Amino acid sequence: MHFILFDDCVTKLSAAQIEYLASQLLGRLATAGADRKPHVVPTSVRFNAELGTIDVGGHHVADTKKYRDVQANGWAAIVVDDLVSVDPWTPRMLEIRGRAEAIPTGGKHLGPGFGEAFIRIHPEKINSFGVE
């Protein structure tokens, strides 16, 4: 298995990481608001090949804590993971951290599970496991 550790982080997704993201529709978004308290929620996720960003959506996103958190501090992280097999144990994981934008319009065209508002993450640190 291949590790990309935080000390050796890359800021652009590899072809294998992009392919993995395209195969997964759900991720776990982590944010923190002005109070610095963590918040993690499952959410729709998609790689934006044109911009090299991660678009995060859901229904009525503009009314959510995750959206308000991004508006408050402009940072987010997302984990996309799955378990290929339990015997042998074969997990895969992609963690992406970066600057985030709360975007009020244009999300509906991004795909299933997206409403009008969405969050866009600009990758600054990428950590992967089992995604070659």
Predicted regions: what is each one?
Residues 1-132:
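Binding-site signature for planar aromatic cofactors or substrates
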